[in-house]
């Protein structure tokens, strides 16, 4: 009999596309609660209170209490732990998801384990995962932007950096995406280049790259340009010189 045959509902964890509940039962996950802020502070002699000098979000650390299981024999348990080591060790951040947050993805990698008791083919362990990026990611959103002021709403709960994509319907000598406050241009991205009909321009505000038909044309981006960000839960008004598409990923803390 498989251990899952006696359980009504199983909490699942996916790591780099692999369902780890094939190897262990999750008891508890820590590191997903109200998030802390790291503050740099200083005081001035003779002055009441203090001064906050810096603020930042620390890396996220996920702790997973688990019970590794086999078929009831110590030999099978050892083999499963060997294979679990193979699955966990990664040299890049990978997607991590939990069944109680089906539309959220963390990105991190396994760091270390704290061993617990082992008895009767079961092994208790706490697995620690280090997420350089403290944010978790939701679905990807695609919105069209026209040559008139267009509202784009970031429905996430954190600032996100969009990717702009334009397939040129006519030839042009420049492309511009503007961020507006009423009729005022707050910031813009402008690319001066000889664009032909059918060319595909991609401006990635996260990677800070500009490509045309897959080729780098970063030098064509005007130095006065400023990368566009979408603030959470509000409309950002954008306007383009050619019909374009904005793609962004919702982010959460």
UniProtKB/Swiss-Prot annotation:
UniProt keyword terms in alphabetical order: Viral genome ejection through host cell envelope, Viral long flexible tail ejection system, Viral penetration into host cytoplasm, Viral tail protein, Virion, Virus entry into host cell
InterPro entries reported for this sequence: Dit_BPSPP_N, Siphovirus-type_tail_C, Siphovirus-type_tail_N
Location in the cell: Virion
Gene3D superfamilies for the chain: 2.40.30.200, 2.60.120.860
One Gene Ontology cellular component annotation held by this UniProt entry: virus tail
Primary location recorded for the protein, binned into one broad class: virion
A Pfam family per the record: Sipho_tail
GO term, biological process aspect, one: symbiont genome ejection through host cell envelope, long flexible tail mechanism
Subunit structure: Homohexamer.
Function per UniProt: Forms a 40 Angstroms wide channel at the distal tip of the tail. Remains associated to the tail after DNA ejection.
Protein name: Distal tail protein
């Amino acid at each position: 009999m498989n251990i899952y045959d006696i359980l009504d509902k199983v909490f699942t964890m996916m790591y780099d596309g692999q369902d780890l509940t094939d190897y262990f039962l999750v008891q508890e996950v820590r590191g997903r609660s109200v998030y802390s802020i790291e503050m740099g502070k200083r005081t001035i002699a003779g002055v009441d209170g203090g001064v906050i000098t810096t603020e930042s979000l620390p890396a996220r650390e996920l702790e997973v209490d688990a019970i590794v299981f086999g078929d009831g024999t110590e030999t099978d348990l050892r083999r499963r732990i060997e294979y679990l080591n193979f699955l966990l060790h990664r040299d890049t951040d990978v997607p991590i998801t939990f069944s109680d947050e089906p539309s959220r993805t963390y990105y991190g990698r396994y760091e270390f384990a704290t061993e617990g008791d082992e008895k009767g083919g079961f092994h208790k362990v706490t697995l620690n995962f280090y997420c350089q990026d403290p944010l978790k990611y939701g679905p990807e959103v695609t919105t069209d932007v026209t040559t008139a002021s267009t509202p784009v709403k970031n429905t996430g709960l954190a600032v996100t950096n969009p990717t702009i994509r334009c397939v040129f319907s006519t030839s042009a000598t420049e492309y511009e995406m503007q961020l507006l406050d009423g009729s005022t241009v707050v910031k813009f991205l402008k690319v001066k280049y000889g664009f032909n009909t059918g060319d595909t321009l991609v401006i990635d505000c996260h990677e800070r790259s500009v490509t045309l038909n897959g080729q780098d044309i970063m030098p064509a981006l005007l130095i006065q340009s400023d990368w566009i960000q979408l603030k959470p839960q509000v409309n950002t008004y954008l306007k383009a010189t050619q019909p374009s598409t904005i793609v962004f990923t919702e982010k959460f803390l």
